[in-house]
A protein has these predicted regions:
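Short coil/turn connectors at secondary-structure junctions
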Residues: 86-90, 99, 113-116, 134-139, ...
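Phosphate/diphosphate-binding glycine-rich loops and adjacent basic-rich segments that engage nucleotide
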Residues: 436-527
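Conserved active-site and cofactor/substrate-binding residues in soluble primary-metabolism enzymes
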Residues: 35, 39, 61-68, 98-101, ...
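Cofactor-binding active-site loop characterized by glycine-rich and histidine/acidic residues
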Residues: 29, 33, 45, 62-189, ...
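Thiamine diphosphate
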Residues: 123-290, 354-445, 567-568, ...
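Conserved acidic/glycine
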Residues: 1-72, 174, 202, 208, ...
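General beta-strand structural signal in soluble alpha/beta enzymes
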Residues: 93-94, 168, 196, 231, ...
């Protein structure tokens, strides 16, 4: 726990009451708001950049942007608290959960969270995860994090509290989600007192909406749904206050579309897509040089790095990011095609995450087949499936694994239409996921919901989660030309290469992947049992197996990279073993282990069985998320010992 003093004097925040029936600020009110605005932006720049300097990443620009709205809202809350005529629910709802720095700042200002706690933003087990989680962080009043989910939710809150006005911070990115369109229609139809404060900064992760989605306008879209819409400069305090007063004193839903550059006034960042992520230390230092805050500069320069993941027995020092490899391997495949054939038969759909899912490499190499689809996962998946409607064509789709849950119905309809889709869902599991629970990709096997067709043909959906970079490369190359829907999962974290017992790589550079075949990473003796694993859990399981074998326990390890097909030969081998433990980073209720035991029983298994998986909400931080779930080598070894008695 740091003993440093927080370098921004949050105690100097000036609490004022703002009466929305008086739409003009006094000089005193304006000065107080300007002071509070600068104070809050200073705080957000510091503790987010400090976390970034420590290696915890995060998001700075969104919470930085919406501070003018925030300080005015707190004035409305204070007036309502003092008995003002207009009841305002004192919650700053936010549909962009990555702007969680706003909620932590509020918790500190309201005395729910010690100010020094902000030094530990996104750190392991410090209760300040990368998205707000109700009941986990003191002072945080709601959970948010998946775009497009909050407005529909607070429509219901508004119905439950018809005597209150609700305010929600929105964004031009989140408003691209289809559920916001549904929420708009419901709010208008029922005249709900929901007021939207939309940060329209023309920036999302992968680009500028004006460039990649010409014709899209937040204001015109909301007007089309029937909302009253006010467009203005979000950095003009007086005008913003007047517009917010008009919104709060009118009946029914209102949207204030507040135009501004991303991160206005922020060195190196203003107006750029880099503002979505954590502010770089260099930018924050320049900012505090302008502010004359040497203490903040010194703290950022000397921020202690979080400790890195240990190396485990049986795996290499060298690591690679499979999520990035996906795009690189796809470029290699596409380069071998004739240009006309490539453009005619392949289309790649991005959901504003091209840099994170690896497909930016495809965008750069073959822009003619790349679709910058914005933040519209459901529609983009269906478009990819529609492109793959013809037998000789296929759509390629990529987003985070957490958002697979949003696409289940589209996946089902694609299956009914016999579509060809190669879907890469990165950030699977929980490893390195400081963004925490709402971004966990743990229900990925929901994708495997097909049944036999009318003609008796088996469902050809395939689900792959290779646990080694060389195997991942071979998998993508092998399954590219297969028919049907193929789901390839990767982790956020970099993972090492698996090693043979002699120290050489288990999978060579020319390895040929065979769908449905399990690999025996370590064989057990005639009386030995097995651990079955995949993904980023696999090399941790290997570490556990190596430790157990060193201490006289006869145990082997199986890599099950194809998750929804049984390898009969391997299953017979496992069915004859005295014990089997499945260790995985998917949901313990919906993952491989929940069904694997039944398949063993069908083959005559009489041994002991157990499975490990994600069984509780996250703890923040990076690689320690796995140990928190009992999925590090120590946890897996302990479970093996408990299983054998």
């Amino acid at each position: 726990m740091t003993t440093a003093t927080f370098p921004v004097d949050l105690a100097s925040y000036k609490t004022i009451a703002l009466d929305p029936s008086v739409p003009t600020l006094t000089d005193e009110q304006r000065d107080a708001l300007a002071h509070n605005l600068q104070l809050c932006r200073d705080a957000i720049v510091f503790f987010t950049a400090y976390a970034g300097a420590r290696g915890l990443s995060g998001h700075s620009g969104g919470p930085y942007d919406t501070v003018p709205e925030l300080v005015i809202l707190r004035g409305f809350f204070e007036h309502s608290k003092q008995g003002g005529a207009t009841k305002v629910m004192p919650i700053v709802w936010d549909e962009a959960g990555h702007r969680v720095a706003t909620q932590y700042l509020l918790a500190a200002l309201e005395g729910e969270l010690p100010i020094e706690k902000l030094f530990h933003y996104r750190e392991y087990n410090e209760h300040l995860p990368g998205h707000p989680e109700r009941g986990y962080t003191p002072g945080v009043k709601f959970s948010s994090g998946r775009l497009g989910h909050m407005w529909p939710y607070i429509n219901g809150v508004a119905m439950a509290h018809p005597d209150h006005v609700l305010f929600m911070l929105g964004s031009d990115g989140s408003q691209q989600e289809g559920t916001d369109a549904e929420a708009a229609r419901l709010a208008v139809a029922h005249k709900l007192n929901v007021k939207l404060l939309i940060d329209d900064n023309n920036v999302t992760i992968a680009g500028h909406p004006d460039d990649y989605m010409p014709g899209y306008s937040v204001a015109k879209t909301l007007e089309g749904h029937g909302l009253d819409v006010s467009v203005g400069n979000g950095e003009d305090l007086d005008a913003l206050y007047t517009r917010m007063c008009a919104a709060i004193t009118s009946d029914g839903p209102v949207a204030l579309v507040n135009k501004r550059l991303m991160a206005p006034g922020m060195p190196e960042i203003e107006g750029s897509t880099h503002g979505h992520d954590v502010f770089k230390a260099s930018a924050a230092i320049k900012y505090f040089e302008q502010r004359g805050n040497q203490q903040a500069i010194d703290l950022i320069n000397n921020a202690p790095k979080v400790d890195s993941r240990p190396q485990y027995p049986g795996s290499s020092d060298e690591t690679d990011a499979n999520r990035s490899l996906f795009g690189k391997v796809m470029v290699e495949i596409l380069q071998e095609m004739e240009p006309e054939e490539r453009e005619r038969t392949v289309r790649v759909f991005d959901c504003d995450l091209e840099g994170s899912t690896g497909i930016k490499a495809i965008h750069e190499a073959f822009p003619e087949i790349f679709v910058a689809g914005g933040i519209m996962e459901r529609g983009n998946y269906s478009a990819a499936a529609g492109f793959g409607f013809d037998e000789d064509k296929q759509g390629v789709f990529a987003t985070f694994s957490a958002f697979l849950e949003m696409c289940i119905s589209e996946i089902t309809m694609a299956r009914f239409n016999r579509s060809n889709v190669l879907a890469h869902f990165s950030h699977a599991g929980v490893d390195d996921m400081a963004d925490n629970t709402c971004h966990f990709g743990i229900n990925n096997l929901f994708a495997d919901g097909g049944v036999a067709g009318h003609d008796g043909s088996p469902d050809n959906t395939r689900v792959y989660f290779p646990g080694d970079p060389a195997q991942f490369r071979a998998c993508v190359k092998r399954v590219f030309t297969d028919k049907g829907q193929r789901f390839v999962f990767s982790n956020r974290s970099k993972i090492p290469y698996l090693l043979k017992e002699d120290g050489s790589r288990f999978y060579s550079d020319d390895h040929r992947f065979e769908p449905g075949k399990d690999d025996l990473i370590r064989d057990a003796g005639p009386s030995g049992g097995y651990v079955v694993s995949y993904g980023a859990t696999l090399y941790r399981a290997l570490g556990a197996v190596e430790s157990l074998r060193k201490n006289g326990v006869d145990v082997g390890l199986v890599n099950k990279a194809t998750l929804n097909v049984e390898d009969d030969a391997m299953m017979q081998k496992l069915a004859a073993a005295p014990f089997v433990l499945v260790a995985e980073e998917f949901n313990i209720k919906t993952g491989l282990g929940a069904r694997f035991g039944s398949q063993l029983l069908k083959r005559g298994f009489t041994g002991r069985y157990n499975h490990l998986g994600v069984h509780k909400e996250g703890c923040g931080g990076l690689w320690r998320q796995m140990g928190f779930q009992g999925l590090d080598p120590e946890g897996i070894e302990k479970s093996v010992r408990e299983l054998i008695g």
